[in-house]
Amino acid sequence: MAASETAPFGVSAASKGGGGVAGARAQHGQLAVAGRVHDALVFAAGAVAAVLVLLATASFLSPMPVTNLVAFRSLPVSVASTSAASAAIDADVGVRGGPGAAGRTFYDDSRVSYAVEVGRRGGITGWDARRAAWMRLRYPRGLNATAAGRERVVMVSGSQAPPCRGEGGDHLLLRFLKNKVDYCRLHGVELLYNNALLQPRMLAYWAKIPAVRAAMLAHPDAEWVWWVDADAVFTDMDFSLPLHKYKDHNLVVYGWNKEVYGERSWVGLNAGVFLIRNCQWSLDFMDSWARMGPASPEYARWGSVLHDTLRGKSDKESDDQSALVYLLSEHEEKWGAKTYLEKGYFFQGYWVEVVDRLDDIAARYEAAERRPSAAAAHLRRRHAEREHERYAAARNAAVRGAVPGPAGGGQSGWRRPFVTHFTGCQPCGGEPNKIYSKKSCADGMNRALNFADDQVLRNYGYRHKDPLSDEVRPLPFDYPAAR
């Protein structure tokens, strides 16, 4: 019923009821109260119906705005129930917040800025204490009440705002984004995807620093912020970050100590994926890192310094990766001591070393599940997606016991490569580095994305027809024993 229909109904019912009740009052005093109750109920029903219709209409006429900063919650809820669900979760764990929340926090301090302001004196100070004070106010029962003691992680990724120049580039970016959404959903990680240039002069690979810094302030409840380049693919959906391994460190980067600290090679690490703790050390570090970028008046000088200092650097451009190597090697005690160069697994693997091995790796996992044992039969059981982590742990144990080699998931490990990074392929720009062909990049990206997607689709009873096909087929019962 439309809202315009309910209003006349309410008015006419009231006016007619008024005359009827007056006559009833004179003749039948006992019926007067019943008549008023009846009319009140009719009016109330009409009013409620009108409000519900107006709300429903408003939801269609005023859809939620789409911004260029998109956040994905780790636990999906329907749009209609988002506020109610969040309020219920907050109430369950004793979260205190909202516009009228008591107590001032760093958000009320006008001197605290989300922006990277290169060259400006000051910056955020006392962040550890400010963050702790915010959490005491907002989480009086403790932050980890809903996360089984896990440290919270926010993943940040992003791409450019304009459409891609390369043919099919936007479609590839969508597939890369889907891959990250899938991983985050399976592992309880929140994803923030940004395509706004938060600092106009910090272009290209430098744009990650303002995004990560802003995420730290927007998510003080997150212990870690995890930057992942747009062209990086999660190729092991079972793997969870070993955060306990980094308890004494504030920055985790894929790299090698010898190449960074001994040889000072500009390719001794890769800055396309990194994990950084939400703390004062990290804010100070990113300020120092940003001062070597294009927003700095000394940008050209830093390019010359990096060229003269780092082994193998042929150009005089100050890029984020070279700057990171310089900071760690030049200030090893200040920055290097709290940085973990991860090489025990493919925190980000070079795609050329990975994609040709994916078929063999998939066969290795399937062989472990086809073994004639009760444990393998248990792994083949169909299950709900929310049970993924339990099955992942059991599957890793089965493969580890069946396949020789280290546990890392690197070039010789038994594990799937965790992240495969298509550095140099430039899927959005359309022109890969001259050392790669377009076909090798296209096939490699498609193969890696399908390899990862098969791990997700299995929970839904499907897989890709072949490693390079978009077509999917249903899985037989008791897969992979039945093929």
UniProtKB/Swiss-Prot annotation:
Predominant localisation class: Golgi
Entry keyword ATP-binding: no
Gene3D superfamilies assigned: Spore Coat Polysaccharide Biosynthesis Protein SpsA, Chain A
Residue numbers on the Lumenal membrane side: 62-483
Membrane-spanning residues: 41-61
Keywords carried by this UniProt record: Glycoprotein, Glycosyltransferase, Golgi apparatus, Membrane, Signal-anchor, Transferase, Transmembrane, Transmembrane helix
GO molecular function, one term: galactosyltransferase activity
Keyword Glycoprotein: yes
Pfam families in the cross-refs: Glyco_transf_34 (PF05637)
Family designation: Belongs to the glycosyltransferase 34 family.
Name this polypeptide is given: Probable glycosyltransferase 6
Native organism: Oryza sativa subsp. indica (Rice)
Organism placement in taxonomy: Eukaryota, Viridiplantae, Streptophyta, Embryophyta, Tracheophyta
Gene: GT6
